[in-house]
Curated annotation (Swiss-Prot):
Belongs to the TonB-dependent receptor family. BtuB (TC 1.B.14.3.1) subfamily. Ca(2+) 2 binds at D213, D215, Y249, D250, D261. A motif (TonB C-terminal box) lies at residues 597-614. The lineage of its organism: Bacteria, Pseudomonadati, Pseudomonadota, Gammaproteobacteria, Enterobacterales. This is Vitamin B12 transporter BtuB. Its main location: membrane. Disulfide bonds: none annotated. Keywords: Calcium, Cell outer membrane, Ion transport, Membrane, Metal-binding, Porin, Signal, TonB box, Transmembrane, Transmembrane beta strand, Transport. It comes from the Bacteria. Residues 38-152 form the TBDR plug domain. Cyanocob(III)alamin binds at L83, S85, N92, V110, S111, A251, T309, R517, Y551. One of its GO terms (molecular function) is ABC-type vitamin B12 transporter activity.
Length: 614
């Protein structure tokens, strides 16, 4: 059975690995309840991706990392840097909470959903990904799941890397972490990435004029962190990063008007924290500030022309979290405060606005014999829509040694974004979107196979839709999502296998029509092995049929997009103990497919890279 001490000492060895790239159940995660705990004690399905996984996959974007994970469906308007959406278990892209080191991603407050095509892969040291409701812990947005991107580096040393590939792709990266005495360490990183790209849009989706040009992407990134241990229990940190991106895209063109087809994004974030890590009590206080400027403009006229748009947001947050060990588990409590300030014109609002939110939450985890219980409750006080409460509860029963049944229920919500509230078509009387979710799961270890199978249902109400007749946003939509998820990982001799299957039936509960851009079925398979010092990896992904809208003519028609099977091949060779050379072929069989109707994907792509560590 699961050892009770595992909840106290974070050193359990159990069968329950919850499908992760790092398959050790001892892996510590912080996202589930904001404090470190073994992944095996988290009842929600959880995936952990390490930097070693990212290097082995040779991913050049965050989207390429996330697309491999269970329950994730990513759509993108073309290649690198183009607009993308993350759907988790069939929910809307705006129903995914994206955190950077536990702090809400700033830009999501403007658009209502996180576009991770712009976030630099160089900053990602690990990813913790939890499926299911988490609003009772984090507040708004956590309906489909939570993605926590962690930038903290674990190992000291210096790495220099470079890569080249198809479509004139090039990447140069330098990072270092140095120990200053016994108690202080400094981390620095600089990254440059550029691709000429390709023409992403077929004629018809850009108005009356084709735009046969390359739609490229350029990103420059800087990162710095200082960490200091004052005593064995007290520590603190200061951290900051910024990136400067330029994206060329194909836009809808009206004759006689400027062609707005270039995006320039400036983003910077700073945070500082103080932590206490005692034997029974843990506490942390974190403050953060982030500022983003997102321009869209015609390069012939520049960013400051009247035809250009600017979305600008400043975000301030304070988080105070506490955790105490009680019995064979723990209790946590904390307060979140957030202020978002927008400039005039952001998200087409007529004036600048401030929005404040204060959340108070309580979490608990306890083991009683063969049973594990988890619960959370939260109350948010928002300056726009007032108070809103959420809660969730889960129970796990190890009915046979190595086999567990889990049942859970949770509520969650999504606050209306600033454009929906205050934009030209906005409605300041909007309520939050609300969700009720149920899930049942079995998991275990059978003949060396770590497996989990779960079924879930998610009813979402008060969805915010645009009314063509009144030209306003209203809470009038409903969605009903049912799904099955199965995951497994196992070894056969020198081969390591990781596989997942997703079936998602996501429908408009009023019209009973499928929700757009969600694949009904997905199969994902990762095979890794080593042969004569070469590390090989094969990635397979099947994307099932999905529906979308054809916007090339009015009235817009619903179109059905066929499924596709995709293969990637990656290989790495350690030339010396310091120098590693890597190569990859993505979309090995050059499949022609789209995830957004009318926006082409890249086809077969090659990359070659090398890294030197010392």
């Amino acid at each position: 059975m699961i050892k009770k001490a595992s909840l106290l000492t974070a050193c359990s060895v159990t069968a329950f690995s919850a499908w992760a790239q790092d398959t050790s159940p001892d892996t510590l995660v912080v996202t589930a309840n904001r404090f470190e705990q073994p992944r095996s004690t988290v009842l929600a399905p959880t995936t952990v991706v390490t930097r070693q996984d990212i290097d082995r996959w040779q991913s050049t974007s965050v989207n390429d990392v996330l697309r491999r994970l269970p329950g994730v469906d990513i759509t993108q308007n073309g290649g690198s840097g183009q607009l993308s959406s993350i759907f988790i278990r069939g929910t809307n892209a705006s129903h995914v909470l994206v955190l950077i080191d536990g702090v809400r991603l700033n830009l999501a407050g403007v658009s209502g959903s996180a576009d991770l095509s712009q976030f630099p892969i160089a900053l990602v040291q690990s990813v913790e990904y939890i499926r299911g409701p988490r609003s009772a812990v984090y507040g708004s947005d956590a309906i489909g799941g939570v993605v926590n991107i962690i930038t903290t580096r674990d190992e000291p040393g210096t790495e220099i890397s470079a890569g080249w590939g198809s479509n004139s792709y090039q990447n140069y990266d330098v990072s270092t972490q140095q120990q200053l005495g016994d108690k202080t360490r400094v981390t620095l990183l600089g990254d440059y990435a550029h691709t000429h790209g390709y023409d992403v849009v077929a004629y018809g989706n850009t108005g009356t004029q084709a735009q046969p040009d390359n739609d490229g992407f350029l990103s420059k990134t800087l990162y710095g962190a200082l960490e200091h241990n004052f005593t064995d229990a007290w520590s603190g940190f200061v951290r900051g990063y910024g990136y400067d991106n330029r994206t060329n895209y194909d836009a809808y063109y009206s004759p006689g008007s400027p062609l707005v087809d270039t995006r320039k994004l400036y983003s910077q974030s700073w945070d500082a924290g103080l932590r206490y890590n005692g034997e029974l009590i843990k506490s942390q206080l974190i403050t953060s500030y982030s500022h983003s400027k997102d321009y869209n403009y015609d390069p012939h006229y520049g960013r400051y022309d009247s035809s250009a748009t600017l979305d600008e947001m400043k975000q301030y947050t304070v988080q105070w979290a506490n955790n105490i060990i009680i019995g064979h588990g723990n209790v946590g409590a904390g307060v979140d405060w957030q202020k978002q300030s927008t400039a005039l014109g952001t998200a087409y609002v007529k004036d600048g606005y401030d929005q404040r939110n204060t959340g108070i939450y309580l979490t608990g985890l306890q083991q009683v014999g063969d049973f594990t219980f988890e619960g959370a409750a939260r109350s948010d006080d928002n300056s726009q829509f007032g108070r809103h409460g959420t809660w969730q509860t889960s129970a796990g029963w190890e009915f046979i040694e190595g086999y567990r049944f889990i049942a859970s229920y949770g509520t969650s919500y999504k606050a209306p974004n600033l454009g929906q509230l205050y934009g030209f078509y906005g409605n300041p009387n909007l309520d939050p979107e609300k969700s009720k979710q149920w899930e049942g799961a079995f998991e275990g270890l059978t003949a060396g196979v770590n497996w989990r199978i779960s079924g879930y249902r998610n009813d979402v109400s008060d969805l915010i839709d645009y009314d063509d007749h009144t030209l306003k946003y209203y809470n009038e939509g409903k969605a009903r999502i049912k799904g099955v998820e199965a995951t497994a990982n196992f070894d056969t001799g020198p081969l390591t296998h990781t596989v997942s299957y997703d079936y998602v039936d996501a429908r408009n509960a009023i019209t009973d029509t499928p929700l757009l851009r969600r694949a009904k079925q997905q199969v994902k398979y990762q095979l890794d092995w080593q042969l004569y010092d070469f590390d090989w990896g094969i990635t397979y992904q099947y994307l099932g049929t999905r529906y979308d809208k054809d916007y090339s003519s009015y009235p817009y028609q619903t179109v059905k997009m066929g499924g596709v099977s995709l293969w990637d091949l990656a290989v790495a060779y350690p030339v010396t103990s310091h120098l590693t050379v890597r190569g990859k072929i993505a979309n090995l069989f050059d499949k022609d497919y789209e995830t957004v109707y009318g926006y082409q994907t890249a086809g077969r792509e090659y990359t070659l890279s090398g890294s030197y560590t010392f």
